[in-house]
A protein has these predicted regions:
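Pyridoxal 5′-phosphate
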Residues: 1-372
Length: 372
């Protein structure tokens, strides 16, 4: 099997699985319980939170555990909207966002919120002048992802933050799902940040919203005690402990991993440039993600042709549906490219042998499936 869909999800690290199983067996108490077993679980959660905080350079009190990035994005957006709608009903975002950002914003329009989409340059980076222009006295939130999940565009979060911070009362949220575990991120540049552990070889079903300590938002889940007043529900002790382990492992030898992935990326791009395709990723894309468009073949047809050869890549993102990519359309203004896009996502587990096999099969499929 050749797995080239690491941005959709990653296989779980064996050490992470071992941690999860051990905690399931040895820590049976509800961390909200006052007896010894409950206190043991709570102590483990506190230790795990401190470990996560140390790795990310934040305070453990700033962590709100969620079921994943989608819930964290919803909590950030809906929590701010509910708390601060009296101050204003204007939110700014981009067309590059994950559906778990765009859909809650669309939902808020039903309640009178105005959503503005900042312009992008030809590389897919935020136009800072347009962002400045869009911010008004009614703006309460800007939500812009650190790394786009489809074509991997890395936004200049520091410059974006400077523009936003010139306006008192405007909060900055960033979906950092595609960069955590792959590159460093400065959490002090944003008020809130969302991520999912399944993207860095952790378990599915656990993620977090990192929220500035003194920022108050409304919860979207009510009833039931948890680690924070901002998200109800019994804390998932095994998932939290395994998340801490996965995050620590993800940042071990990060520079070495980044160097290896850069070499693989360049090797893959060189091979792809020789095929009858259009590459959508560019110099501002993270090295883990390579997006390209087929010229005369439907992406779904190619997806299943590759699957027959035990090769797995994506069309658009795993959490989105639709006939074309809004991300690529917003950058290229080319419906054909947006309708025929495919995403390869690699990791430090990917090998050159796998890439060679993928290129060999892709090349053969392009010749065989042309005009389908």
């Amino acid at each position: 099997m050749v797995y080239l869909d690491y941005s959709a999800t990653t296989p779980v690290n064996d050490e992470v699985i071992n941690t999860y199983v051990k905690v399931c067996k040895d820590f049976v108490g509800n961390p909200n319980s006052l007896h010894k077993l409950g206190l043991q679980s709570k102590k483990l959660i506190d230790a795990s939170s401190k470990q996560i905080a140390n790795v990310l350079g934040i305070k453990s009190s700033e962590i709100i555990y969620t079921s994943g990035a989608s819930e964290a994005n919803n909590l950030a957006i809906l929590g701010v909207a509910s708390k601060y709608y009296g101050r204003g009903k204007h939110i700014i975002t981009t067309q590059l966002e994950h559906s778990s950002v765009l859909e809650p914003l669309k939902y808020l329009e039903k309640f009178g919120f105005k959503i503005s989409y900042v312009k992008l340059d030809k590389y897919g980076r935020v136009d800072l002048n347009d962002l400045e222009r869009l911010i008004t006295k009614d703006t309460i939130l800007v939500s812009i992802c650190a790394v786009n999940s489809e074509i991997g565009i890395i936004q200049d979060i520091e410059s974006i933050s400077k523009v936003i911070k010139k306006h008192n009362g405007v909060l900055f949220h960033s979906d950092v799902t595609q960069c955590i575990g792959k590159m460093q991120f400065k959490f002090n540049l944003v008020d809130m940040a969302s991520f999912s552990c399944q993207k860095f070889f952790g378990m599915k079903g656990i993620g977090a919203l990192i929220k500035r300590e003194n920022l108050i938002i409304d919860p979207i889940i009510h009833g039931g005690k948890s680690t924070t007043i901002f998200r109800s529900g019994t804390p998932a002790t095994p998932l939290i402990a395994s998340c801490a382990k996965a995050l620590r492992l993800a940042y071990e030898d990060l520079v070495k991993k980044e160097k290896y992935i850069k070499e693989l990326h360049d090797y893959l791009i060189n091979k792809l440039n020789k095929l009858d395709i259009d590459i959508n990723s560019n110099e501002y894309s993270i090295n883990n993600i390579i997006n390209f468009s087929l010229r005369n073949i439907k992406s779904e047809v190619m997806l299943h042709a590759l699957e027959e050869k035990d090769i797995f890549i994506s069309t658009q993102t795993a959490c989105s549906t639709g006939s074309f990519s809004k991300t690529i359309m917003s950058i290229t203004n080319d419906l054909n490219r947006a309708s025929r896009s495919m995403r390869i996502s690699i990791s430090y587990l990917t090998t050159k042998k796998e890439i060679d096999y993928f290129i060999e099969v892709l090349s053969a499929c392009i010749k065989e499936l042309k005009f389908m």
